[in-house]
Amino acid sequence: MFIATVIVSVMLAVALTFSAIGKLTKNPSVIPMLEQVGVPADKIPWLAYAELLGAVGLLVGLAVWPIGVAAAVGVILYFVGAVAAHLRAKDKDFAPAAGLAVFAIVALVLRVLSA
């Protein structure tokens, strides 16, 4: 079970890191979508920092399970918020955020079961 936890946590941490890099480097394929769902430009770096903290928490959480649980819960809430932002803006392109939310739920369940 712990091997599955490591695989899922590392994959999610990598996805979060790449997403954060896209925001911090103002990737032209990322920023317009964020603005379309109503994220103010000055808040975009804070979303990236939250993603990076989630990634670090998931990785540290492999050694200290309560941190992993807290990080997974935070990542779930982050992506639930992302899905809500898409729905509020009537943007139908929320599948990536929803998929990552499900992935974070899997990470949480695995971390709890392998604690």
Question: Where on the chain are the PLM-derived regions?
Answer:
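Membrane-interface extramembranous regions
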Residues: 1-115
